[in-house]
């Protein structure tokens, strides 16, 4: 059975970019050894509503790239520009810590292989919390969370704890949480890593549909080459650089 993911034409303007990374470099220091360069001059641009997949061997730098794009880590060199506004110039962040945290909460959603749902809170509460933290208003947050979860086929599971949900349901809750603040960009790191093939397929088709409907940009790290090939663009990470899949 093949994935049925409709490609779409992202963005509304030829020159408009949601995210632009220019010559990003990241190295890590190792005791008694020269610094290990993980990313070596990464260039990446992502348009509004575009879905980009990144494949590559374990340890090739894919997760490091997502951490930089999500402002969870700092580049050594290069620039990161989000929706036309510079965020990093080299290792210098142009926002204060408070501004950066607020920016990340408003503009970027994250989905991980391990969903990181809070075990003592229901599906509804886990999703609502993403908005509640920023607004302090619980009732409207729960109302919006309920609508979003219903759209993702979880209407009957709102009051269930994560332990009472299947793996596929848990990841759908994680996606709802990532979308709660209407981010312009969602970064996903091996979101189907713990799912069977059926749930993986459903998850990827869901993300492709959301990307199209909401004009939300997605950058997804995956080992699923079948899905990767259905995205608007597939990139391969090797030796700290990106190139087109098959290139």
Swiss-Prot record:
Keyword Cytoplasm attached: no
Domain ABC transporter: 19-247
Entry's Gene Ontology molecular function annotations: ATP binding; ATP hydrolysis activity; transmembrane transporter activity
Keyword line: ATP-binding, Cell inner membrane, Cell membrane, Membrane, Nucleotide-binding, Translocase, Transport
Enzyme class: translocase
Record Gene3D superfamilies: P-loop containing nucleotide triphosphate hydrolases
Location of this chain's protein in the cell: Cell inner membrane
EC numbers, comma separated: 7.6.2.-
Any Pfam family hit: ABC_tran
InterPro entries with a match to the protein in the record: AAA+_ATPase, ABC_transporter-like_ATP-bd, ABC_transporter-like_CS, ABC_transpr_LolD-like, MacB-like_ATP-bd, P-loop_NTPase
PROSITE patterns per record: ABC_TRANSPORTER_1, ABC_TRANSPORTER_2, LOLD
The protein's assembly and partners: The complex is composed of two ATP-binding proteins (LolD) and two transmembrane proteins (LolC and LolE).
Family indicated by similarity: Belongs to the ABC transporter superfamily. Lipoprotein translocase (TC 3.A.1.125) family.
Physiological role: Part of the ABC transporter complex LolCDE involved in the translocation of mature outer membrane-directed lipoproteins, from the inner membrane to the periplasmic chaperone, LolA. Responsible for the formation of the LolA-lipoprotein complex in an ATP-dependent manner.
Name used for this protein in its record: Lipoprotein-releasing system ATP-binding protein LolD 2
Gene: lolD2
